[in-house]
């Protein structure tokens, strides 16, 4: 019975649909598309022109999103809080972190947590909870001769290890071992491990860096690799703030990818008293040429690096642009990218 009713319904519908009229080549209000050459290539070129135009126009559009009031530091911070909230949202810093008393020491029966000793500090392998099953790992440099003068999160580039910027393994010049130098000057220093740029085939398919692989996975969850790494940094800020109270002096300093995380973390968290950025600060108008894991949806609508700096203000922001990471990622199924110092990019 159901099949008979369905057939009757289909027949009644077809009986009222007019037959197509011969000789009509276009729909009303349209005209035939006439293009010469490779249509697909022309489409890509048109999209490219449009996006570059939008990037160029984004700089002038940003002002409408800002209502800065510089009458006092407190009033200023309140006036830019909507921008700070927007930045947190697009970076994926939206989840509640796991509270903890202190980082746990990482040791085994073959390797103690104390991995090295300096003239004025001890170095421990540590890990700390962040979100759910996500933990931060790295090295903690603790002064041995006096109470810490400040608490600093020192963030290496993605192609550096905590051991390298602490001077424990080769790979970073002595003058650039900033975690070691901070500890030598009486700071307690936490050095997180970042996801690296190691490039390899994934599932025997496209060759992706470790960062691009996790960037793509996090995108499906409505989050961002940058956001997860920021949570690791801010979990350390939570700990420093709890231990030091209102008098805690907290700083972040990073190089390359670490400089990016330092700038973002100071922009979104006013508990950070001072921020140092090395090998990152500059124009983001060529963001499309940088590693894809730096891509943040809607970022340039409100934020270039200069706008991020205004979120750090009036707290001190130190920018050191003498050296930048040099990265060249070929396209082997993943996104190609080039990183170089701005002056080198201009020479090219």
Language model segments and positions:
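Cap/lid segment of the alpha/beta-hydrolase catalytic domain
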Residues: 147-243, 249, 255, 280-291
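Preferential activation on post-signal-peptide N-terminal prodomains/segments
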Residues: 23-63, 67-68
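Serine-hydrolase catalytic core
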Residues: 264-267, 284, 301-348
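Primarily recognizes the serine-hydrolase "nucleophile elbow" in alpha/beta-hydrolase
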Residues: 235-311
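Boundary at the C-terminal end of the N-terminal hydrophobic targeting segment
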Residues: 18-22
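Short secondary-structure boundary/capping segments
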Residues: 168-171, 205-210, 268-270, 290-294, ...
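Non-catalytic accessory segments flanking enzyme active sites
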Residues: 53-141, 235
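Bacterial N-terminal signal peptides
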Residues: 4-15
């Amino acid at each position: 019975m159901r099949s008979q009713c369905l057939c009757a319904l289909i027949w009644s519908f077809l009986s009222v649909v007019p037959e197509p009229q011969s000789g009509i080549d276009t729909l009303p209000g349209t005209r035939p598309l006439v293009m010469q050459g490779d249509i697909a290539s022309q489409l890509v070129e048109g999209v490219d022109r449009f996006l570059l135009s939008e990037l160029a126009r984004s700089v002038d559009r940003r002002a409408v999103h800002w209502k800065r009031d510089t009458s006092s530091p407190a009033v200023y911070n309140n006036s830019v809080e909507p921008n700070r909230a927007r930045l947190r949202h697009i970076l994926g810093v939206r989840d509640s972190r796991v509270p903890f008393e202190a980082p746990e020491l990482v040791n085994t029966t073959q390797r103690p947590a104390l991995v090295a000793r300096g003239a004025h500090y001890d170095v421990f392998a540590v890990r700390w909870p962040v979100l759910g099953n996500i933990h931060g790992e790295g090295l903690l440099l603790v002064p041995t001769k006096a109470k810490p003068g400040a608490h600093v999160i020192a963030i290496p580039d993605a192609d550096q290890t905590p051991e390298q910027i602490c001077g424990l393994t080769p790979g970073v010049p002595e003058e650039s071992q900033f975690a070691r130098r901070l500890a030598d000057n009486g700071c307690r220093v936490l050095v997180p491990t970042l996801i690296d740029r190691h490039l390899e085939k994934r599932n025997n398919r496209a060759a992706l860096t470790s960062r691009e692989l996790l960037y793509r996975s996090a995108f499906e969850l409505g989050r961002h690799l940058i956001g997860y790494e920021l949570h690791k940094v801010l979990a350390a800020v939570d700990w420093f703030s709890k231990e030091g109270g209102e008098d805690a002096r907290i700083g972040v300093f990073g190089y390359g990818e670490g400089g990016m995380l330092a700038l973002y973390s100071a922009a979104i968290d006013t508990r950070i008293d001072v921020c140092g950025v090395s090998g990152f600060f500059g124009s983001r108008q060529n963001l499309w040429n940088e590693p894809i894991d730096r891509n943040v949806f809607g970022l340039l609508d409100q934020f270039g690096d200069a706008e991020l700096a205004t979120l750090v203000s009036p707290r001190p922001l130190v920018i050191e642009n003498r050296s930048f990471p040099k990265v060249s990622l070929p396209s082997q199924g993943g996104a190609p990218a080039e990183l170089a110092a701005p002056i080198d990019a201009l020479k090219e």
